[in-house]
Structures are given as structure tokens and as C-alpha cells.
A protein has these predicted regions:
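Mature catalytic core of soluble alpha/beta enzymes
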Residues: 2-249
């Protein structure tokens, strides 16, 4: 019988001695349409092997804990699966750098800092994410909007100070938003309004989890379960089981 995946475990977990720190601090390359990119190191928290062959690896990414549970693919042993899970965590850390608005060196931060009306070069990876974000905005008629950075900053400030923003402040923030006012094409992005700031937090973890799943499958690990604490994705079920068993507390 496959083990239960406990969805609330991340609230109580502690940092265990990492038996595979060197594996989680993996440096490799992401290969695909974007070309090659160095993978950043990942803060290791724990890795464990179960009697049924399952490998569980946890790492600190995107300000939270990502957990990858996986079974070795054909011709692999547990060590191979452990290494590949570490690569998947490093993949998430790589995309965090692509999508981060807090990292002053990121392409998104440079786009946020640029004046409106100016064409700003963006990397193929950032362009991919921005185009997907705009697709989501169109599909939801703006319910999802990657340009809401000014509103997010305003309400974070309001919460910190314990004072509601004034109507004028809200109107000012809203005028700087609007996904229709962002143009992305041919490696360039243009903001059509002053003060616009992009925030991809509404899709970042889910996007990273999708890329992790792609990497695991490419490396030959098809039976896996990824948990980013807010987004989960299951691959093929554990060997001999109809699916992954979840327990929600």
C-alpha cells in the first residue's frame, strides 16, 4: 500500500539534518526552448528514503518549503531519484529568479524600474512567463492581472501601518494597473502607463511546479508528487497503486 501524503505536514515540519546536501546544491542546466541556464543552489532541509523505494526531498524555495516525493524510474536506484529530485528543486529556484520582483538583478525588477513607454529587453524565459500571464488575464477578463503590483504594494503598506488607504491612494494605484497596458512581443516589453509594476506571485509557484514536473519526466522519473504548500501536482501513481493517497488535515 502506498504511504499517505499528508497535506498539512509542512506547517509542523522541522529542518532535519540533510543527508544529501551536496545533491540538493546541484548545478546543472535547463535545456529546452530557452537554451541553457545555470541552476542556482537550493537550501536543503531534508531527504529520506522509505522501505518501498520512495524518496522524499525537501528544499526552501520561493519563501516556503517545496517537497518532492518520487519513485526511481526504470534502471534507476534511490540515489539517482534523490539526485533528480534535487535538480527539480533547483529548477524551481531558477524560475524564482526569473519571476522575482524582489531581486534587483532579475529581468522583472528591471522591467518594473523602467520608465513607461520604453521598450525593455526581456529574456526568452521571462517573455514566456509574461505571455502566459497575459493569456491568463485574457481568459479571466482581468480577474487575474499581473500588473497589480501598485495595488499589492499599497495594501501591504496599509496592513503594516494599520491604516486603510485613502480613496485617492486607491485610485492612483488602480490607474497604474491594467494588463491591457502591457505589451510583450519579440523579446521586448513595454509598459503603457506610469507607475506600473508587475507581480507574478499569483502564478509563480504553480508555474514552477509545472516546470519541475517536466524536468522529472525528462529525467525518467514519472511517479512523483510535488507539493509547494499552495500548489500540488501528481505524476504517475506509486508502483502497484491506482493513485496517490492524500490526507487533508
Amino acid at each position: 500500500m502506498s504511504p499517505w501524503v499528508r497535506m498539512s505536514s509542512f506547517f509542523r515540519q522541522a529542518a532535519f539534518p540533510a543527508c544529501c546536501a551536496c545533491l540538493l546544491s546541484v548545478a546543472g542546466a535547463i535545456r529546452g526552448q530557452e537554451g541553457e541556464a545555470e541552476l542556482p543552489s537550493v537550501e536543503p532541509l531534508s531527504c529520506a528514503h522509505s522501505p518501498d523505494g520512495r524518496v522524499t526531498v525537501r528544499g526552501a524555495v520561493m519563501g516556503t518549503v517545496f517537497t518532492v516525493r518520487a519513485y526511481p524510474g526504470s534502471g534507476m536506484d534511490a540515489g539517482d531519484a534523490e539526485r533528480i529530485c534535487g535538480e527539480a528543486l533547483a529548477c524551481a529556484a531558477h524560475w524564482e529568479k526569473v519571476m522575482s520582483a524582489m531581486d534587483a538583478e532579475s529581468g522583472l525588477a528591471r522591467l518594473n524600474a523602467a520608465e513607461y513607454g520604453i521598450s525593455v529587453p526581456v529574456s526568452p524565459e521571462l517573455e514566456r512567463v509574461l505571455l502566459l500571464a497575459l493569456d491568463y488575464a485574457r481568459l479571466t477578463n482581468g480577474a487575474f492581472d499581473p500588473t497589480l503590483g501598485p495595488c499589492i504594494r499599497l495594501w501591504k503598506k496599509s496592513r503594516r501601518l494599520g491604516i486603510l488607504p485613502s480613496g485617492e491612494e486607491r485610485e492612483c494605484a488602480l490607474r497604474a494597473c491594467g494588463w491591457e497596458k502591457l505589451s510583450v512581443r519579440k523579446g521586448m516589453a513595454v509598459k503603457a502607463v506610469s507607475g506600473m509594476r508587475l507581480d507574478l506571485g499569483g502564478m509563480g509557484k504553480g508555474f514552477a511546479v509545472d516546470r519541475m514536473a517536466e524536468m522529472l519526466k525528462t529525467r525518467g522519473v514519472c511517479s512523483f508528487f510535488i507539493d509547494s504548500t499552495s500548489d500540488v501536482l501528481a505524476g504517475a501513481p506509486p508502483p502497484g497503486e491506482p493513485g496517490w493517497r492524500l490526507r487533508v488535515d
